[in-house]
């Protein structure tokens, strides 16, 4: 028994719309403990849609459709499903009445085209749409195959799913065992290196452990299928603790933890403060601190020192350092960190200076070269050289800010 998600709409194939529906439904199926192995996107073409339905109905027992329920000629989902299973369409008076009421509430009259939305396969149950004019259906056209259809509008689909579809699935016995997951997050280690360290955990069956790589970090998802969250935690916790111990300082948090949140908590625990001096990141590092509510407890402010004159006047970077080493150098990064620490009288001072591109690089100092400076409460200062490569400007700036936060985190733990 498994589910398959079928998203209908040429706009999805063309990339005009981001398919958030499939992400939502995939997570919901996992939460209900319903396995699903296939996701299909098909355009508004009845021939190709029939092919998809024919294949899906042979390999899945729950078919979830989104899109193609509107009143226009290219909205063909319902009638194509009916054709596949040789069922006539019947007009439902209660659907027409509901659509008319919704138009009336908006001071409008229902268009005759909307009558199309009242046609459903004979024997199907209406899946009500509380907000829109496109209802869905719940239908078992053949034994062991249940079809559910939803409009493509995400807000409408989500409400129909939670209010009607989920209770129906639970009444059929689904959801007795659900999947609970915990995401462990790591910085400063590559996916392959982490996978090598924790390779033995990938053979587990309950819980399962799977790696995910994302920009600036690696994640491990630990998932358990149980009847309750308490049981899941009892299974997940020992595995999580073993992995955290193996990863050491490269582990920084779990689930919704961000570097900014984790570093902020460490500063708060130590009752210490921090300030930042930024060049190429243009405030990105400060933004990561201040996106956390209550960050004024430990983050006192920063200076965006883009021009060398600002570096000298506000951060006391020496003209000699700029002349002899250049703005992008370890010496300047160190002086910037000390300068902001002194000016704002914080325990920690941080700095970032680099070449974010796309221009400005040389053979000696290429695009992606970044220096991060950190001055500690005792007045000691260090700098780290980073080479992010010739990547996009946004990525270099983002990785620079993340790396700076991670460097401070490692000094605080």
From Swiss-Prot:
<dbReference type="InterPro" id="IPR036653">
    <property type="entry name" value="CinA-like_C"/>
</dbReference>
<dbReference type="Pfam" id="PF18146">
    <property type="entry name" value="CinA_KH"/>
</dbReference>
<dbReference type="Pfam" id="PF02464">
    <property type="entry name" value="CinA"/>
</dbReference>
<comment type="similarity">
    <text>Belongs to the CinA family.</text>
</comment>
<dbReference type="Pfam" id="PF00994">
    <property type="entry name" value="MoCF_biosynth"/>
</dbReference>
<protein>
    <recommendedName>
        <fullName>CinA-like protein</fullName>
    </recommendedName>
</protein>
<dbReference type="InterPro" id="IPR008135">
    <property type="entry name" value="Competence-induced_CinA"/>
</dbReference>
<dbReference type="InterPro" id="IPR050101">
    <property type="entry name" value="CinA"/>
</dbReference>
<dbReference type="InterPro" id="IPR036425">
    <property type="entry name" value="MoaB/Mog-like_dom_sf"/>
</dbReference>
<dbReference type="InterPro" id="IPR041424">
    <property type="entry name" value="CinA_KH"/>
</dbReference>
<dbReference type="InterPro" id="IPR008136">
    <property type="entry name" value="CinA_C"/>
</dbReference>
<dbReference type="InterPro" id="IPR001453">
    <property type="entry name" value="MoaB/Mog_dom"/>
</dbReference>
């Amino acid at each position: 028994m498994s589910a398959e998600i079928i998203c209908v709409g040429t706009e999805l194939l063309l990339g005009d719309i981001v398919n958030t529906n499939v992400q939502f439904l995939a997570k919901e199926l996992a939460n209900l403990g319903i396995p699903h192995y296939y996701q299909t996107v098909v355009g508004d073409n009845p021939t190709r849609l029939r092919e998809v339905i024919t294949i899906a109905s042979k390999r899945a027992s729950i078919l979830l459709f989104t899109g193609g329920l509107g009143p226009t000629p290219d909205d063909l989902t319902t009638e194509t499903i009916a054709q596949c299973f040789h069922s006539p369409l019947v007009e439902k008076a209660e659907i027409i009445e509901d659509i008319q009421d919704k138009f009336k509430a908006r001071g409008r009259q229902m268009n005759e085209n909307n009558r199309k939305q009242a046609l459903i396969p004979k024997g199907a149950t209406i899946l009500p749409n509380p907000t829109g004019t496109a209802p869905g259906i719940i239908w078992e056209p053949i034994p062991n195959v249940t079809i559910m259809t939803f409009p493509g509008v995400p807000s409408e689909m989500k409400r129909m799913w939670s209010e009607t579809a989920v209770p129906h699935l639970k009444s059929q016995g689904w959801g007795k065992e659900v999947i609970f997951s915990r995401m462990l997050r790591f910085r400063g280690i590559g996916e392959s290196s982490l996978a090598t360290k924790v390779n033995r955990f990938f053979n587990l069956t309950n819980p399962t452990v799977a790696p995910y790589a994302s920009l600036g970090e690696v994640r491990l998802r630990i998932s358990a299928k149980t009847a309750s969250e308490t049981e899941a935690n009892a299974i997940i916790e020992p595995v999580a603790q073993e992995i955290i111990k193996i990863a050491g300082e490269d582990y920084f948090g779990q689930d919704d933890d961000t570097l900014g949140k984790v570093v902020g908590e460490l500063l708060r625990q130590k009752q210490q403060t921090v300030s930042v001096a930024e060049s190429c990141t243009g405030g990105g590092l400060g933004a990561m601190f201040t996106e956390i509510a209550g960050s004024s407890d430990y983050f006192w402010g920063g200076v965006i020192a883009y021009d060398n004159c600002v570096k000298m006047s506000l951060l006391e970077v020496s003209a000699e350092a700029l002349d002899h080493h250049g703005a992008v150098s370890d010496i300047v990064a160190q002086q910037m960190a000390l300068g902001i620490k002194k000016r704002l009288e914080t325990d920690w001072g941080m700095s970032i200076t680099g070449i974010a591109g796309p221009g400005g690089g040389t053979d000696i100092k290429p695009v992606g070269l970044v220096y991060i400076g950190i001055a500690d409460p005792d007045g000691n200062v260090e700098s780290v050289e980073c080479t992010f490569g010739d990547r996009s400007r946004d990525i270099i700036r983002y990785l620079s800010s993340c790396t700076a936060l991670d460097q401070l985190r490692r000094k605080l733990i």
